Amino acid sequence: MALALVSVAPLVSMRRSLFSSPYELKSIDKTIPNLVMCRKRMLGRPSIRVSSTASVSNDDGVRRRVGDYRYNHWDEDLIDSLATSYEAPSYLKRADTLVEAIKDRFNSMGVDDGERMSPLTDLYQRLWMVDSVERLGIDRHFQNEIKSALDYVFSYWKEKGIGRGRQSAVTDLNSTALGLRTLRLHGYPVSSDVLENFKDHNGQFTCSGIQTEGEIRGVLNLFRASLIAFPGEKVMEEAEIFSTMYLKHALQKIAVSSLSQEIEYLLEYGWHTNPPRLEARMYMEVFPQDTIYEQKLVELAKVEFNIFHSLQKRELQSLTRWWKHYGFPQLSFTRHIHVEYYTFGSCIATDPKQSAFRLCFAKMSYFVTVLDDIYDTYGTMEELELFTAAIKRWDPSVVDCLPEYMKGVYMAVYDTVNEMAKEAEKVQGRDTLNYVRQAWELYIDAYMPEAKWISSGYLPTFQEYLDNSKISFGTRITILQPILTLGEPLPHEILQEIDFPAKFNDLISVILRLKGDTRCYKADRARGEEASSVSCYMKDNAGITEEDAIHCINDMVNNLLKELNWELLKPDSNVPISCRKAAFDICRIFHHGYKYRDGYGDATIEVKNLVKRTVLEPVPL
């Protein structure tokens, strides 16, 4: 009991100040005297403190720490070998034909193999149609049809829920749970209190115990709905606990089938670690094909998946040329995971028109990784100060004052950020470069305290660590320029509702920093990086074990995810939902990489599987 009190107390105080920050945007410094230093003067200076377990490099006589990272897993030959036949006119024409057929089905809502839709099933049928096209990854074609279907369902929504149809005599768990989830995700004002109607007189969720397929699907949709919880919704927490236990028990009884595969997938990835394109691939494989309409849905999903696969090849080739042009293959001390980052971008931005978003996201994410390896591991303090000053100067002429290994990195950042600012200007109708430069200045400044912690062996408090990590983690860099290219104009005042220091951005940064630390802290410590949320939390709570610290941090993450759900879906936001969803999905995809272990230090089985199933391998037609 004493241990529990020690664990919970700092969480309360932490929540009061979690979203405050000591950082303010500063004007860009035009006078950086450090940049006139001669490279020769740096050679004899000490590097960052070296852990006894860290690998050491002696290039140019400078003692350096290096990470134990493997080289690029995906060579150029593999990328060049990706099939491109799905761009043939016949596939594009077939996709257009299927889209029109499915629109007709949406709009008619009447005929299915000669039978008119019954008023006893029309609500569930509409929800099922919307849910199907979304999970199959083809919903972008049917936005008007989706709205009409959901408007219809919402017009019959009641405090006690809905039945399968508008004339159903009783409410139905499956229809109500699916309705709650789908309507909430589309901004309709539906309360989770509707689930109270499916409890017994003891206040517990109940089931028949027979576990028919219909009942199992109802509980599966209850589980899916429970993950879209807002802060303080106790009934959603209860629904998640009940449905998780029920589904795990059901898996032990039912035969291996499409239903069991779907349950296993959703229990594993849930919602917050479930990349949309990966779910689409899974759903194509388990989707029923008993009717002509169902067959057309699956065929369209597969054709679209493979057409996009052809586009991915061209974009990956472009990214690889960029990666080689700036000399990144020669930086042996850093992680070569540009292909993984492109995969992440293409898992969350699946519209072919969003090429700028995908490539910008991949490049910005890769910059964050390279700079993390430089500032946390490879660079000396004096080199880091020079690079920080160079970013603030924002002038390619300063590259001559940088160490050789930093020159290509600096020019890559300079050129790419400027290039993406021009892309954003096409959408925004204004120059956003100065705003982005300020974001970079703040980000690069936040690395210096962490470098000094490593150099001196200082271990900050938990709050001190989090305040700095909100910026140094780089979330803002990976989100800001990509969303500016999405096609939605974002005036300055609206952009500030989603960009740092807005709560939306803070939540994503803290969630990923905390989750990442629970997977990386041991490897980081071995490289001499003592500061992590785990070690800082243990410092603030003397006597607590690593296991208990991780448990408390995971509880924090679960609570923060509910707050992030609210920030995504709250009705009074002025930020377009497409931009909020893109930022939210960036959190989901990075969270996916941290689900079981550090997916970024070395490509894990899970990350390799993601690359193969969403980029490298087309779907069999």
Curated annotation (Swiss-Prot):
* CDD domains tied to this protein: Terpene_cyclase_plant_C1
Q: Which GO terms describe its molecular function?
A: magnesium ion binding; terpene synthase activity
Where is it located? Plastid, Chloroplast
Q: Name one GO biological process term.
A: green leaf volatile biosynthetic process
In which pathway is this protein known to take part?
A: Terpene metabolism; oleoresin biosynthesis; Secondary metabolite biosynthesis; terpenoid biosynthesis
Q: Does the keyword Transit peptide apply?
A: yes
Q: Which GO terms describe its cellular component?
A: chloroplast
Instruction: List its EC numbers.
Output: 4.2.3.52
Task: Work out whether the entry's keyword set contains rRNA processing.
Answer: no
Pfam families assigned to the protein according to its UniProt record, in alphabetical order = Terpene_synth, Terpene_synth_C
Described by its record, this protein's role is as follows: Monoterpene synthase (TPS) involved in the biosynthesis of monoterpene natural products included in conifer oleoresin secretions and volatile emissions; these compounds contribute to biotic and abiotic stress defense against herbivores and pathogens. Catalyzes the conversion of (2E)-geranyl diphosphate (GPP) to (-)-beta-phellandrene.
PANTHER family linked: (E,E)-GERANYLLINALOOL SYNTHASE, ENT-COPALYL DIPHOSPHATE SYNTHASE, CHLOROPLASTIC
Q: What protein does this entry describe?
A: (-)-beta-phellandrene synthase 1, chloroplastic
The protein's organism comes out as Pinus banksiana
Source taxonomy: Eukaryota, Viridiplantae, Streptophyta, Embryophyta, Tracheophyta
